[in-house]
């Protein structure tokens, strides 16, 4: 269960992303930052697949799966969610509601 520090950092990040997303360059940065954790998890965990196929151990696979789910949920909640929510709020605050503009 995430503690007080986790949610404090989450709220601070959210406020920073809302502020950054009111500018065009801030929206681009928020978009890129929000997609980077998915790439990081992909690069980290695909290295384990050859090991699992060479040594089909159920415990190894169960540990990998549980670690992946826990790490993925914390990483996404901590890095991706504030930037994307901040991006949406920043678009609304700046009056730029055309989403294709950020890409």
From Swiss-Prot:
Record localization: Cell membrane
Where is the chain membrane-spanning?
1-21, 29-49, 69-89
**Topology in membrane:** Multi-pass membrane protein
**Which keywords does this Swiss-Prot/TrEMBL entry list?**
Cell membrane, Membrane, Transmembrane, Transmembrane helix
Q: Name one GO cellular component term.
A: plasma membrane
Name the chain's protein.
Answer: Uncharacterized protein MJ0131
Q: Which organism is it from?
A: Methanocaldococcus jannaschii (strain ATCC 43067 / DSM 2661 / JAL-1 / JCM 10045 / NBRC 100440) (Methanococcus jannaschii)
């Amino acid at each position: 269960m995430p503690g007080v520090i986790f949610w404090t950092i989450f709220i601070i990040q959210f406020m920073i992303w809302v502020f950054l997303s009111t500018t065009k360059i801030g929206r681009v940065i928020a978009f890129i930052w929000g997609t980077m954790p998915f790439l990081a998890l992909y690069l980290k965990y695909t290295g384990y697949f050859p090991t699992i196929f060479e040594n089909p151990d159920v415990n190894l696979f169960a540990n990998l799966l549980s670690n992946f789910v826990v790490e993925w949920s914390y990483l996404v909640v901590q890095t991706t969610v504030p930037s994307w929510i901040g991006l949406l709020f920043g678009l609304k605050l700046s009056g730029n509601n055309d989403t294709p503009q950020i890409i």
